[in-house]
């Protein structure tokens, strides 16, 4: 098998790394418009729950299948969505995390304050409830874990905001999608100010479809309540949801908890568990997933192993997760019509792997798109000793979508790309794409 990767194309250029927030010019997402054009959404605000969902994105559009790009109005979001078997298009936007005033937050009952008779229930007066559990992360933020059903009525709804473009239409209509998830929990984080809740949105990108035409998407929990018994788990778990009604309802249909093992992985107790998850259905009917296990909030570094697991019973159970590579955030899996499945991921560096194995077990070696070595010498003003973000020179949050039976388009960021306008000699934060072709 031969994998050909094209030269990069510039989608969007923002400020220089030195003049921007972490989170700015990151998280490129590729999605189709109802008229067939390709669009890329880029986050251009801080990487914060308070900033998501505030229309702080840049949208660019391509009408030649990704060969060239131009900026477009943010209203294009109403014309985009992932195609469903029914012909509808569906899109889940990230929403803004709810802010709760510090004075309204009840302190967690811990140690001797906790009694055998205590029950965490909904407050009759509509006030904020007691958390089920509280812990502090490496930055000393207080993380409160709540049973969703105990929150005030306006926040206790098991539903996600979606935009649906009905088959034959060109404009999206907002829709509340029902969620079926036992013991569903939500996390609030409080530092020096008010408490901010995790955005109540699914975190997966796009959908996958099984042989029966059911719609699947992925998400993850953060610290959470076990859906089987309500037990507290401070490690994040991967979630798989399935819809059998054209995306109007999603039911929890796969749960992959994180089980630390320092014998195999020295950072096991510091990496915060499984988060971003990629899913693909293989030709033999099995499901494979790639699992991010990188997080700094319990003390781990900005990089960590990425894991692979496989299910042969429709997501009810998964094999024990095994290391897929030494790094991997926001992993992508994509099965092309030619029968080859691609994986894309990174941090540090950006890599593409491929397999023609119908079981998804045997993979080719990684192909390097961006080096995982120190890139800080490319900065406008290189430091003597870089921090990790300067070292990587990219958020390494990639997206991968099909554009042909044997071709995909990869979107990623490069923080040190020369200004293409000719107005400055600076290196700028840039969103790039490359074509990946299976020959």
Regions found by a protein language model. Name each.
Residues 1-439:
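Asp-box/BNR beta-propeller blade signature and adjacent active/binding-site loops
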